[in-house]
Amino acid sequence: ELAEKVGKKRSYISRIESEEGNNIQFKTLKDVVEKGFGKKLKIEFDEYFKNQRYSFTIPIRLIGTPFQIKCWEALQKIKYGQTISYKEEAKNIGNEKAYRAVANANGKNNLSIIVPCHRVIANNGNIGGYTGGIWIKEYLLNLEKGEK
């Protein structure tokens, strides 16, 4: 029901979630995957995890503060398999000293993988943080290097 509404009324996806408290839920994951954007999203994720897709074409709408959106737009410019530091990302948005704020903004990215915050690492070469868990960030970086 919700998947149909989102697919028909909007040209973007910002989040797929179940909000049981508000009585908004998908009946099954199959409902999401087989309809509209969900089908295309599944295809693109399958391709990504097979190293056959290097960027996503799913329309998205970034929802956040102007600073967060600026950070997330910068993330979308980082090429598949490439990493940059939080400091480099801060420099790319015009404020080299804001690397901690950049890291904080990246941590609030709700569209990880599509908006690839996993490609940003600490200035010293360490992996840095990742809201989904460090092991997921490591997996994604290794996947993009072809090392699964």
Regions found by a protein language model. Give the residues of each.
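Short alpha-helical DNA-recognition segment
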Residues: E1-R15
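Short coil turns linking two alpha-helices in DNA-binding domains
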Residues: K9-Y12, Q25, A98
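DNA major-groove recognition helix of helix-turn-helix
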Residues: E17, N106
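DNA major-groove recognition helix of helix-turn-helix/homeodomain DNA-binding modules
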Residues: F26-K42
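Basic nucleic-acid-binding alpha-helical/helix-turn surface characteristic of O6-alkylguanine DNA
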Residues: E34, E44-K97, L143, E147-K148
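…primarily DNA-binding HTH/wHTH and HhH modules…
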Residues: N123-K148
